[in-house]
Curated annotation (Swiss-Prot):
Name of the protein this chain belongs to: Protein Smg homolog
Gene label: smg
The organism of origin for this protein: Janthinobacterium sp. (strain Marseille) (Minibacterium massiliensis)
Similarity field: Belongs to the Smg family.
Xref: Pfam families: DUF494 (PF04361)
Superkingdom: Bacteria
InterPro entries: Smg (IPR007456)
UniProt cross-references to PANTHER family, sorted A to Z: PROTEIN SMG
Length: 158
């Protein structure tokens, strides 16, 4: 699923630039992605859009400035793990994501079905949340999101 998500990010500037679902499935299949992987990724993206709409409607005036402290439930800690929680806190304290985006990231990480989720996959989730909202991470955060693999070719920022 995560390979499909990264491919979509690298290929399409914004989610609305993607072809319709049927054409996208055909294109992804032709490239070599498995049907199950494609279905999971597209389902995950649909749920991301629904979660974003729900939270945006519920908290329309939420800003990037919050002085509250997020307490994680045991289930969330089990799925996220300490490195992921630390990374989310770093992003929020640096004002790179706001509290609503944080909640979307957490919800989508829980929906990924992995426990604990790797930091690399959490970074893809963060990138996809920003991408789905039409927000481009600045160069420094983009480097932070993809700094791990020294042998990989450089990723392109839109």
């Amino acid at each position: 699923m995560f390979d499909v998500l990264v491919y979509l990010y690298e290929t399409y500037y914004r989610p609305d630039a993607c072809p319709d679902s049927e054409a996208l499935v055909k294109k992804l299949s032709a490239i070599g992605f498995e049907e199950e992987e494609i279905a999971k990724a597209l389902g995950w993206l649909t749920a991301l859009a629904e979660t974003t709409n729900e939270l945006s409607d519920s908290y329309p005036h939420q800003t990037a400035f919050s002085f509250g402290i997020r307490i994680y439930a045991t289930q969330e800690m089990d799925v996220l793990g300490t490195p992921a929680v630390g990374f989310i806190q770093f992003l929020e304290s640096a004002k790179l994501i706001n509290p609503v985006q944080r909640e979307i990231v957490i919800e989508r990480a829980l929906a990924a079905g992995e426990s604990p989720i790797s930091l690399e996959k959490l970074k893809v989730i963060v990138l996809m949340v920003l991408w789905s909202q039409g927000k481009e991470p600045d160069g420094l955060i983009f480097d932070e999101l993809f700094v791990d693999d020294e042998d990989a070719p450089p990723r392109m920022l839109h």
